[in-house]
């Protein structure tokens, strides 16, 4: 069993949990190989190498970013996967039925591996115009949230969560609808929007139910679009995302498709909260692309 650890997950709180997590995983009766990594690129490379070397299972200890790196290695393979939610955002793990308690999740994963038990779930596969391919488990953001993330990642001050808060204020001041072309199972939709999300799972950003009806076992992607929304309306609607009630707003539209093409100028998408491919991209729901240890 290969176990990817992220020293910065949950602002470092995982360090104190790690011995207990390893004890929980040990009920599987398998040797455990730790895959520490000091960067996202190293984490992804370590996971790919472990799978290529014949790992019997891959476990990721961390948040959605750590899970995202691990998915690039196990997607579309027979190697079972277990996410242990120990980050600031654990949307994929929670949306796919793992307990919020990391220790309980570790025991669940260990017992499933011991008993030879796994459950298939869908993943989303994204392809850019240059042929680059990425997988994601939760949600792709391709509108205001992606733009805010892009600005926050360029900022050197302030550090910590306040950088993201400042990026929100800056981008709210610059908010304008952008022209998108969506192609849903081949059917084109040209529209102006400030927010576009494509979900395999319901939540992103640490529990915001952006695609509240998404189901990672139905073979479909849920698309949620906020149209020509002004600053005041966006600020008022944003808190409703936590309950998923934003989809009842008259300027919010929802779609469902197996394949989704998203095109717009000047936007880099974010998948599972991680910087991903520049638009345009084509996203496909891949049924049973992942075996979960639960």
Q: Residue locations for each model-derived region?
A:
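Glycine-rich beta-strand-to-loop/alpha-helix junction loops that act as flexible
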Residues: 7, 61-63, 84-86, 200
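Internal helical hairpin/lid segments
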Residues: 192-237, 243
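Glycine-rich beta-alpha junction loops
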Residues: 7, 128-130, 140-146, 199-202, ...
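Catalytic core of DAGKc-family lipid kinases
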Residues: 2, 28, 37, 75-80, ...
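Short glycine/serine/threonine-rich phosphate/pyrophosphate-binding segments
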Residues: 43, 65-70, 91, 121
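ATP/NTP phosphate-donor binding region
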Residues: 1-58, 103-107
